[in-house]
């Protein structure tokens, strides 16, 4: 199974279909056949400032449950799980742990920054400046337009970036796969490798419980402290 949070609801997931395709090629090259399943996610950024944020955390749990349903309803030999963002990455990791089937997580990468290293987190500051009439509406609209120039997780060390790093530190994602810029060809190449490795895990009968051990979690905690990642991962 190739499970992903692909969808058009926000830039973090809009490109994941391309990674799904690459993972499928990797699976095919190793003698397997991919079945693509999708449970798209919401964007915490879009959910802020209104009642939408009340649905954020529960969306993670429902996504994990739906992925479990997908796998249990039609048994598979292995899985590639592909996601980028705040609730989708934890949801995929939860599903992987629950299912304990040979599986690999493929991070969806990170979007590049806008002009002058503009990122989405700065829009709140510019919004306040606009309300105080310190910048013009035209300036504010330019910032809003350029804050998310392409696909991938938001380009700052928030929940999405943190969880991609944590997946790699836990050993459930390929080394070097976290936070690859989404516009680079290396991201697709890594997705294909993830598909290839999934077949290897199945043949070796290597499960997440064999990989995400106490030592792996201790390693992830140390990596988190070393990089000063977001505390919301807890």
Short names for language-model regions:
Residues 221-223:
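Flexible, glycine-rich loop/tail regions that form catalytic "lids" or insertion modules at the edges
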Residues 56-219, 230:
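Active-site cavity-forming subdomains of large catalytic enzyme subunits
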Residues 232-234:
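Conserved small/polar residues in nucleotide/adenosyl-binding loops
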Residues 1-102:
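Long, structured ligand/cofactor-binding scaffold of large enzymes
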